[in-house]
Amino acid sequence: MKKIEAIIKPFKMEDVKEALSEIGVEGMTVSEVKGFGRQKGHTEIYRGSEYTEDFLPKIKSEVVLADGQVEAAAAAIVKAAKTGKIGDGKVFISPVEEAVRIRTEETGEKAV
């Protein structure tokens, strides 16, 4: 099993959700996060005053999948989230040793 974490632009979340649904991914966890990378925040003017916002709003989407689904899911996320502009985000893939479905106590791939 692997966990895919994707940090994406908020307005791309629905596209990513639909893309994952189309390949059979049935669930995910989504969090509102803030961060910066090469984009390095942005400057705004509010009521005549200029200020810098270092951390930009992003969405963090997490899914845990069987190894056989990971490549297709990562590709679907990239395709759906990509705008071609700076700040599109990142996808991280890491191993998951175990999963337990609390309600049924199923373990491993049966739990995801």
Model-predicted regions and their roles:
Residues M1-V112:
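Positively charged, small/polar-rich N-terminal and surface patches that mediate targeting and assembly
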